[in-house]
């Protein structure tokens, strides 16, 4: 049997096409033909996978919230499905879904169980109770994991030194980007308006409220900026009702399948997340030549060097964020220089081909 016939199950929570799901899509399209996806319901991801003849199976009991009844139902359904299909590899994503998937896979005696950490959630927990709950869940999941993929050195440290994973089970494989597809706009001309963009779920983790407060403050001071938010999420409706302006300076675009063209026509990319693994959205923005203003957290700060290809600010600090944005207003030469640096940085370090080869080796070895 060749590696191409290996049966691989990818487990995701949401069928979106945001960063985590696009990482999965990139892996599936480049590696094996015999793939199956399990997620909570049908959506953009399952639609995109039709092109690759990938079977998609939905388990509606998979939810982000911890609910004992639903979680046990989801675990049982996962176990039955994995046992029936006899997968060689189960590759999980997301925190709680990843834990349920790993437990189900080991109970079904799957030979290789892999989990990708897209940012540990417990370091950013809002209370001690939440911290210890999420920490304990990740610690338990360790015993059901054969190989752990981390995207940055901070999560590698947490896995080995806090969760006590064995060193030979942890693999640092950063995300990668298709640099041919995500390329800068040729002969870009900067207007007097500073065009800002955020791509990501409008959710608690991404903290879009901090960005909206910062931009709203600048607009109230008559600073010539415009913000486009690309993405959906549980906070979209309430944020839109609070911050949408009649002058069109704050746009809630919703999700788009045309991220690359949206990035190209903007000037700066902003991501105010509370925690991350290694955001594909930042890699794609840098590859398109956008300097990035992002929070100083693991995953983000390994990609952005202050003053070189963007700048950093502390989480939930809308005042500092507004100052960082102001530092680019009326400075097209600064943006152009950091744009060139951003593109060069990606070309040297974060090609998609290199990343997929490392994942392939992990599957095969």
Predicted regions and their residues:
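Conserved acidic donor-binding segment of nucleotide-sugar-dependent glycosyltransferases
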Residues: 305-307, 311-318, 327-332
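A short, well-ordered alpha-helix in the C-terminal region of glycosyltransferases
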Residues: 105, 320, 327, 334-349, ...
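Short hydrophobic beta-strand element within catalytic cores of glycosyltransferases
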Residues: 38, 291-294, 304
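Aromatic "clamp/platform" in nucleotide-sugar-dependent glycosyltransferases that forms part
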Residues: 255, 274
């Amino acid at each position: 049997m060749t590696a191409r016939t290996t049966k691989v199950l990818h487990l995701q929570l949401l069928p979106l096409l945001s960063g985590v799901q696009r990482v999965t899509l990139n892996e599936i399209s480049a590696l094996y033909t015999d793939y199956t996806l399990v997620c909570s319901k049908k959506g953009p991801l399952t639609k995109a996978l039709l092109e690759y003849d990938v079977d998609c199976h939905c388990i509606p009991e998979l939810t982000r919230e911890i609910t004992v009844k639903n979680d046990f139902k989801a675990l049982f359904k996962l176990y039955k499905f994995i046992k029936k299909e006899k997968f060689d590899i189960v590759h999980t994503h997301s925190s709680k879904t990843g834990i349920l998937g790993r437990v189900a896979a080991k109970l079904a005696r799957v030979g290789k169980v892999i989990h990708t950490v897209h940012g540990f959630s417990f370091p950013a927990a809002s209370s001690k109770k939440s911290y210890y709950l999420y920490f304990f869940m990740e610690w338990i999941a360790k015993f059901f994991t054969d190989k752990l993929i981390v995207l940055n050195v901070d999560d590698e440290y947490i896995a080995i030194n806090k969760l006590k994973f064995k060193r030979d089970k942890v693999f640092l494989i950063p995300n990668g980007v298709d640099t041919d597809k995500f390329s800068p706009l040729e002969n870009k001309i900067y207007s007097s308006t500073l065009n800002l963009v955020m791509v990501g779920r409008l959710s608690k983790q991404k903290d879009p409220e901090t960005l909206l407060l910062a931009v709203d403050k600048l607009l109230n001071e008559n600073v010539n900026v415009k913000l486009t938010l690309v993405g959906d999420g549980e906070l979209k409706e309430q944020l839109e009702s609070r911050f949408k302006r009649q002058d069109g300076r704050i746009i809630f675009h919703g999700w788009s399948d045309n991220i690359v063209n949206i990035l190209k026509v903007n000037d700066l990319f902003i991501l105010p997340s509370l925690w991350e693994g290694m955001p594909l959205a930042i890699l794609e923005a840098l590859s398109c030549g956008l300097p990035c203003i992002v929070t100083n957290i693991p995953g983000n700060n390994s990609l952005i060097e202050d003053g070189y290809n963007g700048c950093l600010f502390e989480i939930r600090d809308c005042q500092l964020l507004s100052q960082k944005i102001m530092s680019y207003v009326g400075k097209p030469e600064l943006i152009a220089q950091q744009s060139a640096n951003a593109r060069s940085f990606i070309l040297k370090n974060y090609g998609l081909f290199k990343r997929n080869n490392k994942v392939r080796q992990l599957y095969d070895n």
